[in-house]
């Protein structure tokens, strides 16, 4: 499912992401825009680590979910990676919250560092009537 921007912003807010671990809703929206373009079906394979990034948050199979084939996988969220591709993003949000609780925080996401950190991110929630 490709989410419409404001619909996703409302859903993330409803699921408690605005201000979670100090990360504003606008920053989460920027992150999901650049990681997946708001697409829950997005997957990207990383040959160097033989891992795959899944879903709207592009959560990685080396550390956070189990896909049955990533070497030395940890499964920090305790879920099957396919769960991260569901239209219902509740479990993906729970896992993203787990990721951001680590010391790295939101900096775990390369796209956030490259496209959101130090940028004006308000455009990602602009006009959404939140």
From Swiss-Prot:
UniProt-listed CDD domains: LYZ_C
Reactions catalysed, as given in the entry: Hydrolysis of (1->4)-beta-linkages between N-acetylmuramic acid and N-acetyl-D-glucosamine residues in a peptidoglycan and between N-acetyl-D-glucosamine residues in chitodextrins
InterPro entries tied to this protein: Glyco_hydro_22, Glyco_hydro_22_CS, Glyco_hydro_22_lys, Lysozyme-like_dom_sf
GO MF: lysozyme activity
Pfam family, one: Lys
Keyword Hydrolase: yes
Stretches assigned to the C-type lysozyme domain: 1-130
Protein's GO biological process: defense response to Gram-negative bacterium; defense response to Gram-positive bacterium; digestion; killing of cells of another organism
Known partners and oligomeric status: Monomer.
Function summary: Lysozymes have primarily a bacteriolytic function; those in tissues and body fluids are associated with the monocyte-macrophage system and enhance the activity of immunoagents.
Misc note: Lysozyme C is capable of both hydrolysis and transglycosylation; it also shows a slight esterase activity. It acts rapidly on both peptide-substituted and unsubstituted peptidoglycan, and slowly on chitin oligosaccharides.
Record-stated family: Belongs to the glycosyl hydrolase 22 family.
Protein name as catalogued: Lysozyme C
């Amino acid at each position: 499912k490709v989410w419409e921007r404001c619909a996703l912003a409302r859903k993330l807010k409803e699921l408690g992401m605005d201000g979670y671990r100090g990360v504003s809703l606008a920053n989460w929206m920027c992150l999901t825009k650049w990681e997946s373009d708001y697409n829950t079906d997005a997957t990207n394979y990383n040959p160097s680590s033989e891992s795959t990034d899944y879903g709207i948050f592009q959560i990685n199979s080396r550390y956070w979910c189990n896909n049955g084939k990533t070497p030395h996988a940890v499964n920090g969220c305790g879920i099957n990676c396919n769960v991260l591709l569901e239209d219902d993003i509740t479990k993906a949000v729970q896992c993203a919250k787990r990721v951001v609780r680590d010391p790295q925080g939101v900096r775990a996401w390369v796209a956030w560092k490259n496209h959101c950190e130090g940028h004006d991110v308000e455009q990602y929630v602009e006009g959404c009537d939140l």
